[in-house]
């Protein structure tokens, strides 16, 4: 089973994944971008830009990472439990300047139509996101501000709705304000 955690920065994806690592010791844990050696280099380019990158070039770098991630991680472990911190869904949401149909087609190509079966979508309100952003050093994407993150979160919701029409997926939407223990319990039940 291929499971992905989705949500903007600071909603607790990494915390919940860490808790699952204690339970699912044989699972494959990965992330996008950066789940492969190529992906680590691309992630560094994308998060710590020293030169401006066009939106189209940025999209194609993310797609290159996704295609490599599919070949190295997803394809070789299709019969195992795979838990990923983000996926193509975030890629579609962050690529706000492009149409969903185009993004879906490009991602289908990069993934050879291998999509997650279960999605855990953690969402946060403005106060929670602002509080958590203020507690960390920000990368170039995080420096875009709270309004940017809220618009991405809104786009994530729209992308998930769009995907329900395209592929067979189960989605669990959770409020990131809940305690990590309560969220963990709900996630464990969803994965059963």
Curated annotation (Swiss-Prot):
NCBIfam families: DTMP_kinase. Gene3D superfamilies: P-loop containing nucleotide triphosphate hydrolases (3.40.50.300). The lineage of its organism: Bacteria, Pseudomonadati, Campylobacterota, Epsilonproteobacteria, Campylobacterales. Keywords: ATP-binding, Kinase, Nucleotide biosynthesis, Nucleotide-binding, Transferase. It catalyses: dTMP + ATP = dTDP + ADP. It comes from Campylobacter jejuni subsp. doylei (strain ATCC BAA-1458 / RM4099 / 269.97). This is Thymidylate kinase. GO terms for molecular function: ATP binding; dTMP kinase activity. Coiled coil: none annotated. The keyword Transferase applies. Pfam families: Thymidylate_kin. It is an enzyme of class 2 (transferase).
């Amino acid at each position: 089973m291929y499971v992905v955690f989705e949500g903007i920065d600071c909603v607790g994806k990494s915390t919940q994944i860490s808790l699952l690592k204690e339970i699912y010791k044989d699972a494959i844990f990965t992330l996008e971008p950066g789940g492969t050696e190529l992906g680590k280099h691309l992630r560094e380019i994308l998060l710590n830009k020293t030169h401006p990158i066009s939106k189209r070039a940025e999209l194609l770098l993310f797609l290159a990472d996704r295609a490599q991630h599919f070949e190295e991680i997803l394809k070789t472990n299709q019969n195992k439990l795979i838990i990923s911190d983000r996926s193509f869904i975030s890629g579609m949401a962050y690529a706000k300047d492009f149409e969903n149909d185009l993004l879906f087609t490009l991602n289908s190509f990069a993934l050879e139509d291998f999509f997650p079966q279960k999605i855990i979508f953690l969402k946060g309100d403005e106060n929670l996101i602002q509080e958590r952003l203020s507690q960390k050093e920000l990368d170039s994407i995080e420096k875009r501000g709270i309004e940017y993150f809220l618009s991405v979160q809104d786009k994530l919701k729209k992308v998930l709705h769009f995907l329900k029409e395209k592929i067979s997926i189960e989605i669990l939407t959770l409020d990131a304000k809940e305690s990590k223990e309560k969220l963990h319990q709900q996630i464990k039940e969803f994965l059963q």
